[in-house]
Amino acid sequence: MNRFFIRAWRAAKLDASLYDEVMADTKAMTQAIIVVFLYGAAVAYGTFGRTGVAGINGAIFITLIGWYVWAFTTYIVGVRLFPETETTADRKAFMRTMAFASSPGWLRLLGLVPGLGGAIFVGASVWMVVAAVVAVKKALSYKSTQRAAAITVVCWILSLLLQGSMYIIYFSAFGVTKSPF
């Protein structure tokens, strides 16, 4: 378990060598799934003060779906639409790197602190995107940081649009009137 938290911390510190390590370690998939689940739980509980109990399960589910859409579309766009000449990637290895890049999202749990929710959400989001750029650059063997950043940000925005739509539908169905963010 100690190795798990060290890896998550290294991802949050933007340690590029971590992504090589995670790509090579096929046994890290369980750890990667736990990182993403903890991210989803942090989002859910970090927004609890604004969404209540009705929001917890929905927030976890929507966050996990949003993360998957972000990671998978980034993989498809990076490998199929805009590869560099050296780009080769294994889908599972790529998903592991993107999972660890979501570790800064654990900070969203601090959204429970009154008045900090919005700032924490924005700060953690930016940090996650930067970590994902490092992960994408390593996982897809990109030489260009700009290419990795452009693909990561565009796919992240697509994921945000999907998540926003899902939140609107879910919270409308359960009568949650406050924004979770």
Model-derived features: where do they sit?
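Selected alpha-helical membrane-embedding segments in polytopic membrane proteins
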Residues: M1-A89
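Loop-to-transmembrane-helix entry motif
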Residues: V22-M29, T97-S102, K143
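Membrane-interface alpha-helices at helix entry/exit sites of multi-pass transporters
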Residues: M29-I33, D90-R96, R147-A150
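Residue-level signal for alpha-helical transmembrane segments in multi-pass membrane proteins
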Residues: A42-G49, A131-V134, I169, A173
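Short helix-capping/hinge motifs at transmembrane helix termini and TM-loop junctions
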Residues: R50-T51, F82-P83, L112-L116, S141, ...
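Selective recognition of hydrophobic, aromatic-rich stretches within alpha-helical transmembrane segments
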Residues: A54-V77, K92, A101-L161
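Juxtamembrane boundary at the C-terminal end of a transmembrane helix
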Residues: L161-F181
